[in-house]
Design a protein with these regions (language model features):
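Short coil-to-helix segment of the ABC ATPase nucleotide-binding domain corresponding to the Q-loop/switch region
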Residues: 1-8
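Hydrophobic anchor residue at the start of the ABC signature
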Residues: 55
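Conserved signature/switch motifs of ABC ATPase nucleotide-binding domains
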Residues: 40-43, 61-62, 93
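ABC nucleotide-binding domain "signature" region
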Residues: 20-32
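Conserved catalytic loops of ABC-family nucleotide-binding domains
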Residues: 86-99
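Helix N-cap at the start of a conserved alpha-helix in ABC-type nucleotide-binding domains
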Residues: 77-79
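Catalytic Walker B motif of ABC-type/P-loop ATPase nucleotide-binding domains
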Residues: 66-69
């Protein structure tokens, strides 16, 4: 289930208190708009909902860094925009998000971009400057 997916590692690997982890997971599901999906299984979720579950899972423990590899790549525009709105909110709260994307429009949302082209690292202070050539 969604809840098991979010809580297994903190409870069994990190040995955190089960009640505390479940409370935190429920709060995260509310923030992700998934409070009614706690007992759902992956086959019952949309792609965007699965991505939001993955973000909630990564957020347990209130990390200061989130790594996101193609977080919108398999999503339709609406779901991708929802994920980016979540990232904007997290960034506004002080979280650092490192995101890998091939989508120039998604890269343009970043405060800072790094582009890799033909194995060479290129840095751009402005997301629009060179985002059309992003091959990261």
């Amino acid at each position: 289930s969604v809840m098991k997916n979010i809580t297994d590692a903190p409870i069994h690997v990190q040995k955190r208190d089960k009640e505390e982890v479940y409370r935190e997971a429920r709060e995260l599901l509310m923030k992700m708009g998934l409070e009614d999906k706690e007992n759902a299984y992956p086959c019952q979720l949309s792609g965007g909902q699965c991505q939001r579950v993955a973000i909630a899972r990564a957020m347990v423990g209130n990390p200061t860094l989130l790594l996101a590899d193609e977080p919108t790549g398999a999503l339709d525009t609406k779901a991708g925009n929802q994920i980016m709105e979540i990232f904007r909110h997290l960034s506004d709260q002080g979280m650092t998000i490192i995101m890998i994307t091939h989508e120039p429009a998604i890269a343009a949302c970043a405060d800072k971009t790094y582009h890799i082209l033909d194995g060479e690292l290129r840095t751009s202070a402005e997301p629009e400057g060179g985002a059309d050539h992003a091959e990261a």
